[in-house]
Amino acid sequence: MSIIVALDAKSQYDALKIVEQLDPTLCRVKVGKELFTHEGPSVVKKLQEENFEVFLDLKFHDIPNTTAQAVCAAADLGVWMVNVHASGGRKMIETCVERLKAGNYQTQLIAVTVLTSMGREDLKDIGLDIEPVEQVKRLAKLTKESGLDGVVCSAQEAKILRELIGQDFSLVTPGIRPEGSNADDQKRIVTPKQAMLDGSTHLVIGRPITKAENPTEMLKSILASIA
């Protein structure tokens, strides 16, 4: 079990101010679209200089060759983990796996199933008249069959996916909120302890840590709750 701190920052300066208060031996960090678009690869390199392993959360989704090139570009940066959208299809994600293997990269590749902000009505709006958990199961199975390292899923789906896919597969879980935290824009949320019990391997936690008065103490408190 590991914690990935989502760096909810617009600038490299703000991101580095957050990680100044964190211990790289206790967590990894996630760089998302907003921060990466503002700062580019330099923010990844700066975080690595501070000894943090980086999950580059850009959710690539394009034609197979373009997506694979982007994934390999991320691997060239030395990131620990990168992700793609499983809904891009088998050919797209398998091409990414093949290119990473051909380049002898060690970067972990995972896939996004259904965004944690999406409910049944949201899926219906895009032509999928199905419960989110059923679509998650479909895409997780496709991801496993295609040779990826894991999926992003809500903790409420983790137990189901463990039974469906088995143990040798990472379940990276956003929507984690310690007891008493605001749900913000996440619809499918759960506590760190429950996520661990349900089979999640990596917990993505942002605002409860980054907006805390003392991020380090909050991180330690969360770690203690799942010890």
From Swiss-Prot:
Phylogenetic lineage: Bacteria, Pseudomonadati, Pseudomonadota, Gammaproteobacteria, Moraxellales
Broadest EC class assigned to this enzyme: lyase
EC numbers on record: 4.1.1.23
Family note: Belongs to the OMP decarboxylase family. Type 1 subfamily.
Function of the molecule: Catalyzes the decarboxylation of orotidine 5'-monophosphate (OMP) to uridine 5'-monophosphate (UMP).
One GO term of the biological process aspect: 'de novo' pyrimidine nucleobase biosynthetic process
Name of the gene this protein is made from: pyrF
Example of a GO cellular component annotation carried by this entry: cytosol
Source superkingdom: Bacteria
Assembly description: Homodimer.
InterPro entries on file: Aldolase_TIM, OMPdecase, OMPdecase_AS, OMPdecase_bac, OMPdeCOase_dom, RibuloseP-bd_barrel
Active site: K59
Name of the molecule in the record: Orotidine 5'-phosphate decarboxylase
Organism: Acinetobacter baumannii (strain SDF)
S-S bridge residues: none
Keywords: Decarboxylase, Lyase, Pyrimidine biosynthesis
Entry GO MF terms: orotidine-5'-phosphate decarboxylase activity
